[in-house]
Amino acid sequence: MIQFLALLAAQAAGTPPTSPTQKLDACVTQARTDPAGAEQVARTLGRAGEACRGVALAGQDDFAGAATAFTAAARNAELAKEARAADYWAQAGNAWLAAGDAAKARAALDAALAAGTLTDLNRGEAYLDRARALVATGDMKAARVDLDLATKDAADDPLAWLLSATLARRMGDLPRAKLDIAQALRRSADDASVQLEAGNIAAAAGEADRAQAAWKEAARLAPDAPAGRSATNALTQFAGDPKK
């Protein structure tokens, strides 16, 4: 359920790109459908093409390479005093998370949020990603603060509510966990990860019937995905239950 902050750029129809910004935007557009080709185009743009190179590398699952490219784009944008710098830092953080480097992700997301230019959903997604990095590095209290902010700015994102519910359960706050997983279910009941966590929370609260029902749904929705397999494993505890 990893999601990159989109670069909202499009080439004007029928008009060949001429300015550096137009060339970058055209490259980013190409990267969404032809990442390998866009990577080659990005190299011809030099420093101005780092953001496109990041999108292109992410599209080829080279997340560490993408993070490095987005970091370069962010630094270049800062030097040029461009408003996109914070967006690039946020994308670098997201890519570092995908690459499995939570410490570098946190540093990039710190820079993104410190800029003060992210707003609304983009800011919420940055708080969400930083919370993920904080959980990965063991700072649960700071993650709680960021998830509270994420669920305000990115309230329509079920992942924000899912992670908030999961963290609440891990911290022993079951009332909060129940409230937040209900919000996630409202937005994405067909997500096996959401159903899995709903079962985990119900089990922690001693609600075996609810846990069993949620885990069964998770296993049905995605039997071959990690969430579905985890749900199937959780259901084995009911194997001897005649009510199963």
Q: Regions from the language model: what does each represent?
A:
Residues 52, 91, 125, 129, ...:
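Canonical tetratricopeptide repeat
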Residues 45-47, 76-80, 115-119, 153, ...:
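Structural marker of alpha-solenoid helical repeat scaffolds
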Residues 27-28, 55, 94, 132, ...:
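Residue-level recognition of tetratricopeptide repeat
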